[in-house]
Amino acid sequence: MIRGELFELECLEYLQNKYRYENVHFHHNGGMDSTMSDISVIKNGKVAFFIEVKDNTAQSGQFVVHPDADSHSFGFSSKNHSIQNPMTYAIIDYMNNDFYRFYNAGTAGAAIDIDSSVFAGWIIGHYQQRNVRYIISHDYNYVILPIRKFAEYFSITASCRIKGSGSSKPAEKDYNFITQAIKQVYKNAIFFQNNKKLYASISAVSYTHL
């Protein structure tokens, strides 16, 4: 479990304590899978919509493009989990107008310097397609905002970069922070290390919603 997921659990606990209704429940979908929305809002036993958890520096979405050196252009990958919206075309058109800068962006990345309203439009469309209605974040206090007001609360930037796949292991220097943060939510958690990995064992009580 890494820091981003711990933040999701803290937000889940806040929602569960703040909004106590008999017919409404919150479910953490778990993991750091960016294709899965963070928290499901379940009303009368059915998923009504989703809430996305974002800290101050979180990524809000991504899509993959493939370069074509012959035509000097980028194309939207068919393997994307997201669906194209009008802002997708605007972003790709901008990249095509400066093809070689983005083609050679490398892992460091190259900034996409267009009006942030384009990025906000893409993010809002991206989340609406996934039935995400609200964002929850935290600075000094928890803030819950409608997805349509995303740009009023966040400064948005974007870049193009070559991205490696796979998850990284937590650094040993962060183990104490990780274990203490988990214990704030799960008092009975037990930890052990094996092959430079940190594992957590958590006991939970099962229950049924009617």
Predicted regions and their residues:
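Conserved small/polar residues in nucleotide/adenosyl-binding loops
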Residues: T208-H209
